[in-house]
A protein has these predicted regions:
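Extracytoplasmic gate region of multi-pass secondary transporters
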Residues: 1-33
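Loop-to-transmembrane helix entry/capping segments in MFS-fold secondary transporters
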Residues: 29, 115-128
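Helix-to-loop junctions at the C-terminal end of transmembrane segments
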Residues: 45-59, 147
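Hydrophobic core of transmembrane alpha-helices in multi-pass small-molecule transporters
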Residues: 87-102
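Intracellular juxtamembrane helix-capping segments at the cytosolic ends
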Residues: 102-116
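A membrane-interface helix-boundary motif in multi-pass transporters
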Residues: 145-169
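Multi-pass alpha-helical transporter architecture, strongest
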Residues: 161-188
């Protein structure tokens, strides 16, 4: 869900500042795709951190770090702007690597290590369907509803939307912390 929110709305949000004279000529507005590409660079680096974090902190904590990273990413997007607040956008893009990799990659590794060989490919398929299929669909429909309800005419209250997305990620993280109980031998 969080991945689809960020994929669907980060660029339109940043480029929406073009309509505000103060920000229209800023680097972030003029080159939003370059700014957003920092996310992919961060992702490439953060994937290298997963073995260390998995061994040291275990699957549950690594996935919780990812969920908190989504909260931070959305919060920074809500608080930032392409002018004096561009550093928040940049930090948000860098946090993306932790948010994406620590959830998706470690989740796939957990499924890989905790399912029998006879059902492993089906379990991986189910994980992908739930995160990138059903989760993506529900996420985009819900996010679009939030964006629509905070848009009047052509003006969207993006700050409120990003804070709602951050609150959602926080609630999911809390629920995950309470209900996810990996076996001790599988936790690290």
């Amino acid at each position: 869900v969080c991945l689809q929110i960020t994929n669907g709305y980060a660029n339109p949000y940043i480029t929406s500042f073009k309509d505000i004279a103060e920000y229209a000529d800023t680097f972030g507005v003029q080159h939003a795709n370059i700014l957003i590409s920092l996310s992919q660079m961060s992702e490439a680096f953060c994937i290298l951190l997963i073995p260390f974090f998995m061994k040291r902190y275990g699957i549950k904590n690594v996935m919780l770090i990812a969920m908190l990273a989504w909260v931070l990413r959305f919060g920074l997007l809500g608080a930032g702007n392409p002018g004096s607040g561009v550093w928040m956008f940049v930090l948000s893009m860098l946090v993306y690597g932790v948010a994406f990799d620590f959830f998706n990659v470690s989740g796939s590794l957990f499924v890989e290590n905790n399912t029998g060989i006879d059902i492993r490919s089906s379990a991986q398929g189910l994980f992908m369907m739930m995160t990138n299929g059903i989760g993506a669909t529900i996420g985009m429909l819900s996010a679009q509803s939030i964006v629509n309800s905070h848009t009047v005419g052509d003006v969207t209250d993006w700050t409120t939307c990003w804070y709602i997305f951050a609150a959602y990620a926080l609630v999911v993280g809390i629920v995950f912390a309470v209900i996810f109980r990996p076996k001790k031998e599988c936790a690290k």
